Amino acid sequence: MGHKIHPTGLRLGITQEHRSRWYASSKSYPALLQEDDRIRKFIHKKYGSAGISDVLIARKADQLEVELKTARPGVLVGRQGSGIEDLRSGIQKTVGDSSRQVRINVVEVERVDADAFLLAEYIAQQLEKRVAFRRTIRMAVQRAQRAGVLGLKIQVSGRLNGAEIARTEWTREGRVPLHTLRAEIDYATKVASTTYGVLGIKVWVFKGEVLSDDSQQQIPVGANPRRRAGRRPQQFEDRSNEG
């Protein structure tokens, strides 16, 4: 069953958290859920080059809080925070309420090559550039190993290298325990549009196990990490709507 069910949905409340954190009545719940979906689609479409791996949405009364986990926070923030204002106005336009209070937090992803969504996005970009899929997968595995992940599985489906018959190819390095509930599995999917059709990409990243004492297994740092030692991840918190 662990190989069939969605890894994130299986571990909600254990090692994973909900992407939308709010409560609503049964009447307003569908509208708010669709609103969250529109916000996420708008952000990924407009800021596709910012490397946004996750969008967390929280609601408090009439205030909307959006947290963006990105590999390139400078693209979102812009000069003197101008990008935040553009993003806020875009979200207000998407929800159809220009008076809605929108608070935006931008958090930099600490290890880019250990993030499943960013790895899937990298693979999709390479495949769209007509790079051979085996070479692309090998390069993605090497990047993830340098980032210090404990296990990785990549699956690509479709007309690989322009073949007449679609097929599925996958590779796995290290441990990817899908049946272990305490295992922190980062899972993401992506679609690559090529001249031969679309290719489906799935990425599983095993980052460690959450132990019973709420401490997490240490992940060894690669011998050649991409990030410089001692550099702290950036975080930008929007407080312009407060007061």
Curated annotation (Swiss-Prot):
Statement: the UniProt record of this protein carries the keyword Ribosomal protein: yes
One Gene Ontology biological process: translation
Organism superkingdom: Bacteria
Keyword RNA-binding in annotation: yes
GO molecular function: mRNA binding; rRNA binding; structural constituent of ribosome
Domain KH type-2: 39-110
One Pfam family this sequence matches: KH_2
Keyword line: Ribonucleoprotein, Ribosomal protein, RNA-binding, rRNA-binding
Regions annotated as coiled coil: none
Ranges of Basic and acidic residues composition bias in the record: 234-243
Region of interest: Disordered: 216-243
Cellular-component GO terms for this entry: cytosolic small ribosomal subunit
Role: Binds the lower part of the 30S subunit head. Binds mRNA in the 70S ribosome, positioning it for translation.
Subunit structure: Part of the 30S ribosomal subunit. Forms a tight complex with proteins S10 and S14.
Family membership noted in the UniProt record: Belongs to the universal ribosomal protein uS3 family.
Protein name listed in UniProt: Small ribosomal subunit protein uS3
Species of the source: Synechococcus sp. (strain CC9311)
